[in-house]
Amino acid sequence: MDNYEYSELLKKLKNKVGNIASIIKPEEIKARLKEIENLENSPSFWSDVKQAGIIGKEKTKISNLLKNYENAFNALNDASELFDLANSENDLDTIQALFDDAPNLEDLIVSLEISMLLSGENDGKNAIVSIHPGAGGTESNDWASMLYRMYLRFCEREGFKVETLDFQEGEEAGLKDVSFLVKGENAYGYLKAENGIHRLVRTSPFDSAGRRHTSFSSVMVSPELDDDIEIEIEDKDIRIDYYRASGAGGQHVNKTESAVRITHMPSGIVVQCQNDRSQHKNKATAFKMLKSRLYELELMKQQDEANSSEKSEIGWGHQIRSYVLFPYQQVKDTRSNEAFSQVDNILDGDIKKMIEGVLIAQKAQD
């Protein structure tokens, strides 16, 4: 990097931060935080626990956004002033230190961008994730299991908590189906980028001839809905089946019909839950999963209508990413058009940067 390149980088980052400021309006955030502070000082505020909780979440979200903005704004100003001073004094060591720190400065601006992109209505919610292997038997089941592990490792890295709702093992390897709840700040905001078809190309460990195989698995992500959101489901539109739980689950497995499957006929959506010994609790969870899926489906329809000139790529049936393990190693996302060679790291849950690239690319297309 030289002086010209660094000057151009500062210009680009200042322009980006300026654009972000025009969108998030920091002064309005400060005014709203002051307003919330005054509300919290009123004794009557805490009498409505539900409303207090909603405002508390808003306060946390906009406080974090303002903090990220101020960190980025101050760091950029400091770097710019130091660069000008170092140039005027011909301080080559300081200039080189600024060059070396340039990637960190860029990361700070990206962090601000992501904070802005995760300020949507549902982004702060928990996420319900389901993984379904495509056709292909053992090979696809194993791929679904690899994706499941990838998301579990991602959740560990991000400090998200995971609760398994339904798990069905494959006959020889992998899994037939898994659904799980991810709890944490912006869980849905991040994981919504995983909605779609994931493609794997590799030499199959299950093929004695060592041939190359292509497998597919679909990932479906929906926000966990608050209880106050009304989703109407008519009895005539659903079929409820009860069956014995399978897979890991202790001594009660296969002894009682505690597992629940709900089929929503108009949409074709099927959800199932065998997480609990209680059929009643599993049924309640399955209904919650169904409501979240129907809500997500409605969001997708609205997205399609908003992009009527060009059908939206956000959907459960669209191939979003390819993971190639043979004859070369690469993970490529079709939405951001970014390619990554650290395949092992990605399959071990290092997917945050890839997800952030998708969120930024999708915002640029809006």
From Swiss-Prot:
<dbReference type="InterPro" id="IPR005139">
    <property type="entry name" value="PCRF"/>
</dbReference>
<dbReference type="Pfam" id="PF03462">
    <property type="entry name" value="PCRF"/>
</dbReference>
<keyword id="KW-0963">Cytoplasm</keyword>
<keyword id="KW-0488">Methylation</keyword>
<comment type="function">
    <text>Peptide chain release factor 2 directs the termination of translation in response to the peptide chain termination codons UGA and UAA.</text>
</comment>
<dbReference type="InterPro" id="IPR004374">
    <property type="entry name" value="PrfB"/>
</dbReference>
<protein>
    <recommendedName>
        <fullName>Peptide chain release factor 2</fullName>
    </recommendedName>
</protein>
<dbReference type="InterPro" id="IPR045853">
    <property type="entry name" value="Pep_chain_release_fac_I_sf"/>
</dbReference>
<dbReference type="Pfam" id="PF00472">
    <property type="entry name" value="RF-1"/>
</dbReference>
<dbReference type="GO" id="GO:0016149">
    <property type="term" value="F:translation release factor activity, codon specific"/>
</dbReference>
<comment type="similarity">
    <text>Belongs to the prokaryotic/mitochondrial release factor family.</text>
</comment>
<dbReference type="InterPro" id="IPR000352">
    <property type="entry name" value="Pep_chain_release_fac_I"/>
</dbReference>
<keyword id="KW-0648">Protein biosynthesis</keyword>
<feature type="modified residue" description="N5-methylglutamine">
    <location>
        <position position="251"/>
    </location>
</feature>
<dbReference type="GO" id="GO:0005737">
    <property type="term" value="C:cytoplasm"/>
</dbReference>
